[in-house]
Amino acid sequence: MEIPLSRYQSIRLDEIRDSSSNPKVLTFPRKFSLRGRRWKNPFGRLSCSSVVQGLKPKPKLKPEPIRIEVKESKDQILDDTQISKSGVTICSQIEKLVLCNRFREAFELFEILEIRCSFKVGVSTYDALVEACIRLKSIRCVKRVYGFMMSNGFEPEQYMMNRILLMHVKCGMIIDARRLFDEIPERNLYSYYSIISGFVNFGNYVEAFELFKMMWEELSDCETHTFAVMLRASAGLGSIYVGKQLHVCALKLGVVDNTFVSCGLIDMYSKCGDIEDARCAFECMPEKTTVAWNNVIAGYALHGYSEEALCLLYDMRDSGVSIDQFTLSIMIRISTKLAKLELTKQAHASLIRNGFESEIVANTALVDFYSKWGRVDTARYVFDKLPRKNIISWNALMGGYANHGRGTDAVKLFEKMIAANVAPNHVTFLAVLSACAYSGLSEQGWEIFLSMSEVHGIKPRAMHYACMIELLGRDGLLDEAIAFIRRAPLKTTVNMWAALLNACRMQENLELGRVVAEKLYGMGPEKLGNYVVMYNMYNSMGKTAEAAGVLETLESKGLSMMPACTWVEVGDQTHSFLSGDRFDSYNETVKRQIYQKVDELMEEISEYGYSEEEQHLLPDVDEKEEERVGRYHSEKLAIAYGLVNTPEWNPLQITQNHRICKNCHKVVEFISLVTGREMVVRDASRFHHFKEGKCSCGGYW
């Protein structure tokens, strides 16, 4: 019998009808015999919707033949007019389609096999269909293929049993995979590797170790890839004790020099916090691969050894080992920690030079860096160039808009993400709600907050409530903010009360601020930032005695306020400044130049209407010290140095380790107006973009 293949090439199974016949539902047996052992079907009763609904081929006016170019094979694939429409031909076409990575077209032909159950299908065709399921990661396809195998009485050999097991693992059907694994009569190392790697990938590390123990008892052997997977499980558990036991086993079996095992050891020790042993495992490798370099560099960066990680990165470059997108993403993360914009520009150039401009991992790291370091427009450019975007990419850019006070852009990006059918998560809502809070977008903020549970089925967490409290505080609705905290259907957290305390500071509500501060002090652990907010509140309102009391409390608790420090990057060098004249690393000529520039700026902005506010320091500070420290805050010194040493057309960016004080915020607004320079200040709270005398924060931070 001949089957018109061209009719089915682009027709979905559910679109095929036949009004002349209406066959009954086909049911497949739950078990079939396999070498004397029963192979259980985890899916039970399966049916084909086309058989249920009947069959009716839908002809096409201009059928297009299948044309496939296979370089590896000299056999030509013939069109519909040249081939005999037999089951063997269909199977051959399916195998060649899979070989050419045309998996969906292969399943369109597979529908014909499902309809004509009389066709005999060989092992190679089943193997091709399994490969298509793995590549598509489609649970529906897995059920169809596995059900078809059972209905045709297919009895797989060990190779195909392992392939079927791998198909279930790769498609996320881990429970069914375990059931199939238990039914395999003769399990080998590959069987164990497939199921163990599946449980590790799903984060079920305890089950993975149980299977590893079972494998050792049954086979008394272990494959090197399985060792590497188990080291990853140890890292997931955070158990260096278990990891060291695996290390000893690898030494006894003589597989410790294997590349996969060595890289697994480096990764395990790094993630468990033992960076010295990670470095030792790295140095013991006979041949250091790109993955090994990436693992050890990432380990140093993960534990805060950014300078050492950067040195290793240069060593990797000098060793001649090729870099990949993961190397560049690590390089960008190190740049973020060290605030080195020039280093990131080098990484960006390397991405383009090495052909990684479309790779999602490194480019998402770029979006994150540019967002965090004041280059949000550049971040958007990189984001738009990405051919594929994951949820991390969307969240990184949205968070960048939030930190830079561009709430409207963040909301538009959120709407665009929803329109693109990308499901938001908790981080997404935190980013967009923070953007609304920073920009004072009350209406949009409340609409998005309510949509979390009502539309997207995501229960708001404490951090989302903190954003809404900040939004209420920005509008001066402090009583409503307290009521909102009390009505929250979850345990109140430090972040929620801290948002209210900051609102009290900005609204200068000292009485409520004291109450909230006492609440925070009793919640523990002690958080220095809350004391700093109270200190600033007292200080800005002239309550010097109360401010001194806050410092005494800090001292009694063993806490201390770090001195205000500001950094500015000029070229590839980072320059730091403390308030007053405490920057001994500069010679007297540079110091005089900086002071002179500050004095000139203060004089210029005074002509534009700026008047110096009275500075309130502690009672034991004399007037001269008060005047000197107040006039030469670290922000002003850094700006003066940057203005002198950078081109006029470049935006000036500085970084502060505290919240920028009210007076300095006002000064920078006037300086941006007088000099015509765009200035970006990153303080402990957020980014402040100063342009033409205005700040992106709108006076609320």
Curated annotation (Swiss-Prot):
In residue numbers, the region (Type DYW motif) covers 607-701
Q: How is this protein annotated for GO cellular component? A: chloroplast
Q: Which GO terms describe its biological process?
A: RNA modification
Which InterPro entries does the UniProt entry name for this protein? DYW_dom, E_motif, Pentatricopeptide_rpt, PPR_At4g14850-like_plant, TPR-like_helical_dom_sf
Segment Type E motif: which positions? 496-571
- Does this UniProt record's set of keywords contain Repeat? yes
> Which residue ranges does the record annotate as region Type E(+) motif?
572-606
Q: Which family does it belong to?
A: Belongs to the PPR family. PCMP-H subfamily.
What is the name listed in the Swiss-Prot or TrEMBL entry for this protein? Pentatricopeptide repeat-containing protein At5g50390, chloroplastic
Question: To which species is this protein native?
Answer: Arabidopsis thaliana (Mouse-ear cress)
The UniProt gene name for this protein comes to PCMP-H58
